Amino acid sequence: TVSISSTDAIGHAYGTRGKENHDVYMQLDKDLAHFLDVLDQKVGRGNYLLFLTADHGAAHNYNFLKEHNLPGGAYDYKQAVKDLNNHLQKAFGIKPVMGEDNYQFYFDDAMIAQAGKKKQEVIDEAIDFLKQDEQYVFVFDYEKVAQTTMPDYIKTRMTNGYMNHRSGEIGFVTRAQYFGAKNAPDYKGTSHGQPYNYDSHIPWLMYGWHVNQGETNQEVTINDIAATVCGMLKIQAPSGCIGKAVLR
């Protein structure tokens, strides 16, 4: 596995439309061409199978969007935690929100228990408060996400990002093209992490051994890579494989 991490770092710093991002992809194109030439020489054309993909896409820089009269903006997660804690202090006498990360709010179980409060009541109150803020499109209890009213594709993607004991108690979806960043007129960067298509739109390319030229319009995901390789090799997929083979 070869990780090409410079595109991620530069994309975060300068945005999807930045000239710096353009430059790094032009250089990457040359590097990939050299890499394929070396494989052809050392391994032999048709004797290797190569996949090219990514783990996420990205939103456009919100200042770029504003310049083109399109919606977008910064989500101030620090202020969100502060406002939520202030509200919960009025309601329960405690500030149990430890922080926000990856569009999830994390709660201090020990603080809630020590105060003699019921955690579910605290979470429900927090959700009711957050839902009043128009910057949130959906706010939900991760333990009850199946009961939440939101489109299936968003619900599925948010559920896929949940892991017990590691994820937060409350998840949320901001308005499209709004992401956690500083709010400044000179901000050039961007981020990702929401279930919208621009965050999940990635390359999915395969090249080499037993791969004919072609394309498909069907939806594919990173999870399909392992399933596809197993299908090509005619072997059983590993226990953790949840994708579908993309075979033509």
Region locations from a protein language model:
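Short, surface-exposed loop/helix-turn segments at secondary-structure junctions
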Residues: 182-191
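Secreted, luminal/periplasmic, and some membrane-associated catalytic domains
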Residues: 19, 30-178
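Solvent-exposed, polar/charged alpha-helical surfaces in well-ordered, non-transmembrane soluble domains
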Residues: 26, 30-37, 124, 128, ...
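Short connector loops/turns at beta-strand edges and beta->alpha or beta->beta junctions
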Residues: 5-10, 177, 201, 207-210
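Extracytoplasmic/secreted cell-surface and envelope-processing proteins
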Residues: 10-13, 59-63, 114-115, 181-183, ...
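Substrate-binding rim/cap in mid-to-C-terminal beta-strand-loop elements of soluble/periplasmic
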Residues: 79-116, 190-233, 247-248
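Soluble non-cytosolic domains of exported or imported proteins
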Residues: 19-26, 116-121, 216-223, 240
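Active-site His/acidic residue clusters
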Residues: 1-28, 34, 66
